[in-house]
Every structure is written in C-alpha cells, then in structure tokens.
C-alpha cells in the first residue's frame, strides 16, 4: 500500500540524513582539530 512506502521512504531519508550529519560533524571536528594544530606551531603533540 501507500503507507508502508511512505514509512520506508521516511526511514531511508532519516538514515541518509543521519549519516550525512554524522559525516559533517566528524569532518568539522577533524577540520577544527587541524586548525588548532596549525595554530599550535603546526604539529601534533606527539611530534612536538
């Protein structure tokens, strides 16, 4: 019927959006960490 299709679509969209936002969140964290490293003499703590 129509309703299972809508529900299935909603779940798929939800999962896709969840993954996208997760990737974005991780990407931003990595990006910010990279900027922080550049700000802090441009090396990781282990390498300094």
Curated annotation (Swiss-Prot):
Tissues where this protein is expressed: Expressed by the skin glands.
Coiled coil spans: none
Highest taxon, organism lineage: Eukaryota
Entry keyword Secreted: yes
Keyword Transmembrane helix applies: no
Signal peptide location: none
GO BP annotation list: defense response to Gram-negative bacterium
Any one cellular-component term (Gene Ontology): extracellular region
UniProt-annotated location(s): Secreted
Family membership: Belongs to the frog skin active peptide (FSAP) family. Brevinin subfamily.
Protein name: Palustrin-3a
Reported function: Antimicrobial activity against Gram-negative bacterium E.coli.
Keywords: Amphibian defense peptide, Antibiotic, Antimicrobial, Disulfide bond, Secreted
Disulfide linkage: 43-48
